[in-house]
Design a protein with these regions (language model features):
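Extended recognition/assembly regions associated with phosphoester-bond processing machinery
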Residues: 1-190
Length: 190
């Protein structure tokens, strides 16, 4: 917890007072940040630059569509295979080899910055609740980046990060309960 005291200072945003506003949920799942694809082999090129552009374009497009709505809060679940691999050998959590764009350290740092950029964009609309949902490709890295975000936004009253180490996360808004899990370990009987 001592790292939190070094968190950057964000100024509190005075949002418009909304009594019965709506929740804006932005769920960009399976980004597989760090994945490398060659278009002639896979049908489409993909790398960290393309992933970053798609991620930020998706957030911008959803923000644009949400104009005119009274947004009370933003719910931003992250993880869900945000990263393509989980270890220094470029493997998933289960050990499946992956084609990676760059070194794992560079991927982690670039992914961390991408999430910060996205959260900062969203926090201009309304307070943001970040929920970390670990995936089958990036179980550990999702937790690590969630911990970094929790520390980073510690002094930011506009952002809350839920990085509890449970595979299922729950979020209540008004009379609605929204639940998340990556789904790779769920069974119909669950």
């Amino acid at each position: 917890n001592d790292v939190k005291e070094f968190a950057p200072t964000y100024h509190k945003i005075d949002y418009q007072k909304i009594d019965k506003g709506q929740l804006l949920e932005i769920n960009i799942f399976d980004l597989h940040f760090g994945k490398l694809c060659w278009g002639l082999e896979t049908g489409d090129n993909y790398d960290t630059k393309i992933a970053r552009k798609r991620f930020l374009n998706a957030i911008s497009a959803i923000i644009s569509r949400a104009k005119g709505y009274d947004i009370k809060r933003v719910l931003f679940p992250i993880g869900n295979d945000f990263f393509n691999s989980d270890d220094l050998n470029n493997q998933t959590t289960a050990g499946t080899p992956q084609d990676e764009d760059v070194r794992w350290q560079k991927t982690f740092r670039a992914g961390r910055q991408l999430l910060i950029d996205g959260i900062d964009m969203l926090s201009q609309i309304a307070p943001v609740d970040v929920v970390v949902v670990q995936g089958n490709h990036d179980w550990e890295r999702s937790f690590y980046v969630g911990d970094v975000l929790d520390c980073w936004y510690n002094k930011n009253e506009n952002v809350n990060v839920n990085n509890n180490p449970t595979p299922r996360k729950h979020y209540k808004f008004g009379n609605c309960l929204i639940s998340y899990t990556h789904g790779n370990n769920e069974k119909v009987s669950d």
